[in-house]
UniProtKB/Swiss-Prot annotation:
InterPro entries: Methan_mark_6 (IPR012025). It comes from Methanocaldococcus jannaschii (strain ATCC 43067 / DSM 2661 / JAL-1 / JCM 10045 / NBRC 100440) (Methanococcus jannaschii). This is Uncharacterized protein MJ0498.
Length: 156
């Protein structure tokens, strides 16, 4: 069987902490390696088990816990800071940027859970309406509005 490592990332608005996440994963009593990180955790084990476990972990706090595959084992000397003398590892800043938007993605997923997926035509029609509302008005029309407003104030 192939080994697999997954990155488990908590959205900023998650109620779960990395420590609580790791304790939860350990209560599942599965033969995987778990490592706590500042953004969540890593899990490593047999490929099928890790994929199944990742889905179960995501359901622990739906739309606030996200997973992605990691290309290196947990203690891989090419990536682990303990072997490289500290500092951020390659890819950390990308992961940090991804984590920054997960709360918004989670809220969007909550809305889909609540309202379902709307037809694309409906979404585009609403978006076009918003764009029309934000379209700039011609200068002459703006001048007329100003004259009306100021004129009514001067008359009062």
């Amino acid at each position: 069987m192939m080994k697999k490592t997954k990155v488990i990332v908590l959205a900023e608005n998650a109620l779960t902490t990395p420590g609580k996440l790791v304790r939860y994963i350990n209560t599942l009593n599965q033969p995987v390696i778990v490592k706590e990180t500042c953004f969540g955790a890593y899990i490593e084990g047999e490929e099928e088990l890790v994929d199944k476990l990742a889905q179960e972990i995501r359901n622990y706090e739906r739309n606030r816990i996200f997973c992605k595959d990691r290309g290196y084992a947990i203690w891989d000397k090419r990536r682990c800071r303990a072997f490289r003398g500290g500092g951020p590892r390659e890819g950390f800043h990308q992961l940090e940027a991804e984590q920054a938007v997960l709360d918004k993605i989670g809220l969007a997923l909550d809305k889909i859970d609540k309202e379902g997926i709307k037809p694309m035509e409906e979404v585009l029609a609403k978006e076009n309406e918003l764009i029309k509302r934000e379209t700039k008005i011609p200068v002459e029309e703006f001048k007329n509005i100003i004259e009306k407003v100021l004129g009514s104030k001067n008359e009062a």
